[in-house]
């Protein structure tokens, strides 16, 4: 069958046998067979014979093969280290840093002032080149946007009721395990709201809940839910009331939440109190939170004053001499005489904290997690040391 099928196709055999290359008149060149020679060069070989077809197929590859140039380093020349632009930039002083250094030299800055930002020179998040300008801005803002004396304009609220509210908020803050920034912002919102509008006594705790809800949303990664605040208040208020108070607070403060609280200055001044260990840091925050309970200390003074006074009092208690260094004076902007009276007030609060009915702050700093700084012995000769 196979042979009969082949014999049935004579025209195919004729095509295969009869097609011959024709000469082009006047040129003496042969036509190229289909896929016989796809090159443009004339080799003079007979394509029809089929000889050297493989060689012709490889020939263009040999002619068009890219030349690889291998560069070998000179044996007598040493290899240069890899140049990193990022490393080069880090090792070079920026224009801002140069101007700041010249400004310090022009202002006659003493060598006794320690550069507390040197350890963060390579930390981009620390913003070392701008940190001094940032805190100068904070000092300006706290003077312009201070909280006015509002107790006289609140007929149903007095200083004692405010202290009770702050004591309860400290306890709620501890139970929710919130960040320190949240507590300071909460108290700031409470005082600012009270200075702007009248609040009834029965709504004072609701004000604290709304302020802490806002502070949590602003500072925390995982903020407690509204129902958590309803539960912590023993269902004294419902969800709708808490949300309504939140909206009212934001409206009164005009959504201005980014404010310099005492915590902002505490973080900076603790860093300036070199050397500073964990015990001293906890003691500074303990004294500062005791100050938050007192209306005159918080409302009638700037946040930076409370922070500086807490650092000074802590150094007195731990007998870190000198009590007020040139570094602290430079970064706080306060002299020792300016903060001494406020430090005495914090010391008195500390001495009476264990006997007070409002013991949330005392309990918070009596545990090992906070170095038990609330249990440190009192400093009887504090007034003598300050004299």
UniProtKB/Swiss-Prot annotation:
Gene3D superfamilies xref list: Cyclin-like
SMART domains the UniProt entry points to: CYCLIN, Cyclin_C
Keywords: Cell cycle, Cell division, Cyclin
A single BP term in Gene Ontology: mitotic cell cycle phase transition
Source superkingdom: Eukaryota
A single GO molecular function term of this UniProt record: cyclin-dependent protein serine/threonine kinase regulator activity
Start and end residues of each stretch annotated as Disordered: 1-29
Protein family: Belongs to the cyclin family. Cyclin AB subfamily.
Name under which the protein is recorded: Cyclin-B1-4
Source organism (scientific name): Arabidopsis thaliana
């Amino acid at each position: 069958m196979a042979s009969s099928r082949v014999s049935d196709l004579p025209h195919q055999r004729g095509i295969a046998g009869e097609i011959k290359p024709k000469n082009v008149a006047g040129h003496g060149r042969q036509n190229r067979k289909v896929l016989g020679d796809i090159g443009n060069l004339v080799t003079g070989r007979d394509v029809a014979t089929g000889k050297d077809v493989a060689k012709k197929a490889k020939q263009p590859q040999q002619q068009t093969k890219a030349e690889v140039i291998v560069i070998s380093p000179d044996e007598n020349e040493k290899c240069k280290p890899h140049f990193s632009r990022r490393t080069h930039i880090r090792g070079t002083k920026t224009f801002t840093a140069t101007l700041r250094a010249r400004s310090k030299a022009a202002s006659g800055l003493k060598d006794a002032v320690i550069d507390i930002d040197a350890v963060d020179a390579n930390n981009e998040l620390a913003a070392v080149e701008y940190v001094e300008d940032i805190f100068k801005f904070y000092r300006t803002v706290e003077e312009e946007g201070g909280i006015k004396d509002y107790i006289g304009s609140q007929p149903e609220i007095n200083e004692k009721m405010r202290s009770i509210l702050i004591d309860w908020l400290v306890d709620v803050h501890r139970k929710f395990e919130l960040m320190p920034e949240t507590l300071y912002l909460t108290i700031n919102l409470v005082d600012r709201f009270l200075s702007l509008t009248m609040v009834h006594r029965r709504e004072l705790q609701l004000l604290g809940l709304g302020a802490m809800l806002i502070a949590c949303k602003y500072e925390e990664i995982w903020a407690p839910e509204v129902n958590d605040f309803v539960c912590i208040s023993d269902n004294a208020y419902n969800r709708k009331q808490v949300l309504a108070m939140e909206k009212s607070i934001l409206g009164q403060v005009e959504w201005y939440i980014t404010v310099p609280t005492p915590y902002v200055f505490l973080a900076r001044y603790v860093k300036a109190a070199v050397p500073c260990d964990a015990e001293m840091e906890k003691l500074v925050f303990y004294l500062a939170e005791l100050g938050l309970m007192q209306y005159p200390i918080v409302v009638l003074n700037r946040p930076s004053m409370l922070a500086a006074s807490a650092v000074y009092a802590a150094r007195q208690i731990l007998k870190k001499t000198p009590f007020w260094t040139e570094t602290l004076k430079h970064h706080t902007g306060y002299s020792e005489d300016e903060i001494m009276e406020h430090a005495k007030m914090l010391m008195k609060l500390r001495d009476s904290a264990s006997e007070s009915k409002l013991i949330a702050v005392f309990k918070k700093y009596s545990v090992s997690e906070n170095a038990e700084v609330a249990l440190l012995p009192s400093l009887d000769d504090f007034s003598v040391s300050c004299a």
